[in-house]
């Protein structure tokens, strides 16, 4: 059995289990944006290099040894995608674009390497191509990595794919579908969005990989199910509406205006489609509460999954985070900035 993880008490996780756990979770998270097949492909092969004898020795005999395991999945898929899409008649430029995105995400899932340096210039390659093309004499790519990849591919029917060719086809369709929604004005804009795809795919892959690594020897983190997320969002909405209900009827002209704004924000939160909107109000208008009212109606009525509150000053952010928590409670709230201090017993 090939191992993906082994801890100091001897507990183990197989590479097969880890590969398909990550593939399934990444696909599940990416389905709502139509990228599920592509993320399954990335998840399935992201740790392919761990099949190498050198990495297996690291796990079982020499845990401090450094082994580059991220390159192998990129190298393997680079060739498979090239052969498959070429046979399908996909033009070279389009194929290379897709191929390099897939390879980069896998090769960079333990750290990005998009800075040009003397080494990459010396080889006349970008770092990605140099990394996957450079011979590694002490690795066992054909005997270990390719054989394990072939083994994984025999399991694909259990996950809805006839074979690797079908998975590559569907993954390419996912990417083309996403690309077709963009209206790029020039090549620089197109390249920018390609970099955005890379970071999106990396985020989805890393989320699934980290979760399964944490849970490798038993369930430690259990993400909220969709039904639980819906209930949580509804609880936010009920809480903010309760707060507005406690204000009572306005007794001054200023409070009448505030009440009118609040009702308009509520209506827009219920009906606004995806877009960029601006809430331009003076200090004292109650923008924190208004933002929550708008956002929580969007979460529930427009089926949004997240609400980000961003502000430029830490003092304001800390103050408003506290105000938000007074309404929502702690469940589902992540406060992330440089003044957050992790509290520990020691």
What do the PLM-derived regions correspond to, one by one?
Residues 41-43, 102-108, 278-284, 308-310, ...:
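Extended hydrophobic secondary-structure segments that form protein cores and membrane-embedded regions
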């Amino acid at each position: 059995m090939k191992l993906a993880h082994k801890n100091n008490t001897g507990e183990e996780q197989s590479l097969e289990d880890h590969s398909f756990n990550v593939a399934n979770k990444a696909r599940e998270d990416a389905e709502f944006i139509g990228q599920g097949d592509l993320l399954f492909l990335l998840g399935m092969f992201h740790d392919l290099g761990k099949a190498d004898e050198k990495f297996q020795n690291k796990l079982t005999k020499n845990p401090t040894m450094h082994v580059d395991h991220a390159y192998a999945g990129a190298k393997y898929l680079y060739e498979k995608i090239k052969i498959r899409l070429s046979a399908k008649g996909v033009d070279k430029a389009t194929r290379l674009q897709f191929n390099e995105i897939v390879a980069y995400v896998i090769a960079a899932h333990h750290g990005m390497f998009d800075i040009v340096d003397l080494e990459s210039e010396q080889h006349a390659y970008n770092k990605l191509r140099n990394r996957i093309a450079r011979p590694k004499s002490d690795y066992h790519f054909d005997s270990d990595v390719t054989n394990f990849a072939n083994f994984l591919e025999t399991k694909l029917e259990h996950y809805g794919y006839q074979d690797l060719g079908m998975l590559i086809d569907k993954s390419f369709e996912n990417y083309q579908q996403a690309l077709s929604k963009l209206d790029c004005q020039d090549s620089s804009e197109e390249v920018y969005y390609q970099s955005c795809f890379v970071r999106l795919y990396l985020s989805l892959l890393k989320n699934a990989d980290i979760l399964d690594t944490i849970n490798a020897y038993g369930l430690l983190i259990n993400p909220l199910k969709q039904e639980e997320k819906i209930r949580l969002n509804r609880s936010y909405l009920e809480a903010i509406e309760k707060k507005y209900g406690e204000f009572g009827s306005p007794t001054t002209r200023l409070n009448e205006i505030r009440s009118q704004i609040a009702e308009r924000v509520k209506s827009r939160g219920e009906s606004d489609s995806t877009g960029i909107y601006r809430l331009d109000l003076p200090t004292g208008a109650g923008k924190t509460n208004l933002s929550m009212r708008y956002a929580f109606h969007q979460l529930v009525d427009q089926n949004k999954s997240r609400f980000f509150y961003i502000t430029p000053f830490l003092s304001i952010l800390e103050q408003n985070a506290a105000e938000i928590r007074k309404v929502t409670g702690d469940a589902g709230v992540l406060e992330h900035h440089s003044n957050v201090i992790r509290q520990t017993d020691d």
